[in-house]
Amino acid sequence: MKVQITNSRTEEILKVQANNENDEVSKATPGEVEESLRLIGDLKFFLATAPVNWQENQIIRRYYLNSGQGFVSCVFWNNLYYITGTDIVKCCLYRMQKFGREVVQKKKFEEGIFSDLRNLKCGIDATLEQPKSEFLSFLFRNMCLKTQKKQKVFFWFSVAHDKLFADALERDLKRESLNQPSTTKPVNEPALSFSYDSSSDKPLYDQLLQHLDSRRPSSTTKSDNSPPKLESENFKDNELVTVTNQPLLGVGLMDDDAPESPSQINDFIPQKLIIEPNTLELNGLTEETPHDLPKNTAKGRDEEDFPLDYFPVSVEYPTEENAFDPFPPQAFTPAAPSMPISYDNVNERDSMPVNSLLNRYPYQLSVAPTFPVPPSSSRQHFMTNRDFYSSNNNKEKLVSPSDPTSYMKYDEPVMDFDESRPNENCTNAKSHNSGQQTKQHQLYSNNFQQSYPNGMVPGYYPKMPYNPMGGDPLLDQAFYGADDFFFPPEGCDNNMLYPQTATSWNVLPPQAMQPAPTYVGRPYTPNYRSTPGSAMFPYMQSSNSMQWNTAVSPYSSRAPSTTAKNYPPSTFYSQNINQYPRRRTVGMKSSQGNVPTGNKQSVGKSAKISKPLHIKTSAYQKQYKINLETKARPSAGDEDSAHPDKNKEISMPTPDSNTLVVQSEEGGAHSLEVDTNRRSDKNLPDAT
């Protein structure tokens, strides 16, 4: 592009190099033209065979066009194959570029194709999807759509891609013939040499096919030593093969070209014989054994053809399961390791390598009966009865010296009442049931070693020994599915198997660490307390007890307090009872330090040990002892001399005075003096 500056103004001159570009494009090599035609044929092949030979769970299949257009996808949804309008436009753009025409106005070109797609009606050739539906979301995630608006998604076999391309090309050629701007322009072969004849009886698509066959570089192959890379599908009509570039209407009418067309056909006949040697072998021309035929047929297959068939793993690798040799079968002995049973739902995290922890316990297996694993934990839940019984009948019975089935003879019942009846149906049914029971027992108690290719075994504990003096044997088994067994009412006592005392807990449950709830789930008894008092007597009577709380219903809004200080001692609830604070009384000895103060109580020191209830002195005895000590106190003179700062004073009677001393309830001395002689205050102090 050249730029010319004139009068300080920039003028851009377009299409100056148009003639030079056309000269360069016209000199395109025949190999490039052949490659473009081959890519068009590959796209047509994908559009015709995309819905063939899909995998079981395959949903989408793609075909890569180029870096500009991306992929074209065939989507399998609701048992139908779909293609979006965006992918249809991509196919038309790709074919137009490979044909040699560059798209100038892309938006207008797409509008013309979408206008043709309106002829495909909903329900017949397409389905109408609502905005942001599940199908549109899937297509948008896989780059099949540009938006999730309400639009049509077309059925795969209802779209005529060749007709859409021919109609788009015809519109542009008609605009060019009328000197109107078109959406595409020719830039390369074979579009440069193609001319549309509107007066001809042949439609545009037939003229286009005829021109594409004429533009194949077949005439230049004679000078080359290598054979041409031509596909058989492009030479369906041998009459259209020409050597020289002639006008469109003169194909097949020239007499000079007649002897050359058979030579072209003769050139391809030896190639067919070389590519397809199977016909010679099948006709008996070669004397080879039948087992050599598959090898020869595999060699004669074209390596460039990509297969569309997908083989399962069982076909490609038939001996994959036997790649690892199993462990040698051996009987159960005390020294032999016991591998746990392999379950269907075993996880890799639960697996562990084979080590010394798998050694069996030193006891005989015949002493400990084997309990079968429930079917719900070792087999899939959706197995039908027919599949279950058929799988048992197909498996062979394995005999082990220590297997319980070796000495348990299910075929010989203790009492058989059906032997006197000569009925064949009964005997057959009996033998079938016995064989079925034996095989079912063998299915779950296979004591032989099993193979583990990765060297890992399920990390379950080995079987526990059976102890008749212990708990229930079902609870001692280390396998999942114990909830499938129900305890019979006459077999054992559930209360014995599940004791509620704290001594039977192996691990303290986390509920014991939490505070007690406000609601206590116990039955309401009017004559008993709802809060347990001790382990031996959980519900204490409240009729003869004055220091305990009265009975409270557990269903009431107010629950019994768990922090009260007047509860009796118990193993479940340990409170600090009868612990009084130390208060030092002024003017008293150290032996009189502990004095009760009404109902006020507080927690004592942590190191203080309280005496048992039957050794402690009652509150009434303590008060009585204090009163006796108060009456036997020393004289006031000694107290005043010992404690001069004491405010309490007691007057003593003398022969010259008549004084009455009265003791108050508070322990203080209050005296009332009656002096008949009216002595002066200086001699004796008045009583306060």
Curated annotation (Swiss-Prot):
Subcellular location(s) of the protein: Nucleus
Domain of life (superkingdom): Eukaryota
Subunit structure: Interacts with mating-type protein ALPHA1.
List of residues that carry Phosphoserine: S214, S226, S400
Modification note: Phosphorylated by the STE7, STE11 and STE20 kinases.
PANTHER family in the record: PROTEIN STE12
DNA-binding region in chain numbering: 57-167
Further remarks about this protein from its record: Present with 1920 molecules/cell in log phase SD medium.
Keywords associated with the record: Activator, DNA-binding, Nucleus, Pheromone response, Phosphoprotein, Transcription, Transcription regulation
Disordered, as annotated region: 177-199, 211-239, 285-305, 587-610, 630-688
Biased composition (Polar residues): 217-226, 588-604
Function as written in the Swiss-Prot or TrEMBL entry: Binds to the DNA sequence mediating pheromone induction (called the pheromone response element = PRE) which is found in the upstream control region of several a-, alpha- and haploid-specific genes. Involved in mating of haploids and in pseudohyphae formation in diploids.
Protein name per Swiss-Prot or TrEMBL: Protein STE12
Family per record: Belongs to the STE12 transcription factor family.
Domain notes for this protein: The DNA-binding domain seems to be involved in the suppression of pseudohyphae formation under nitrogen-rich conditions and in haploids. This region is also involved in the regulation of budding pattern of haploids.
GO cellular component terms given for this protein: nucleoplasm; nucleus; Ste12p-Dig1p-Dig2p complex; Tec1p-Ste12p-Dig1p complex
SMART domains per the UniProt record, alphabetical: STE
Compositionally biased region (Basic and acidic residues): 230-239, 288-302, 640-649, 672-688
One Gene Ontology term from the biological process aspect of the record: cellular response to pheromone
KW Lipid metabolism (keyword) present: no
UniProt GO MF annotations: DNA binding; DNA-binding transcription factor activity
Modified sites of kind Phosphothreonine: T29, T289
Keyword Calcium: no
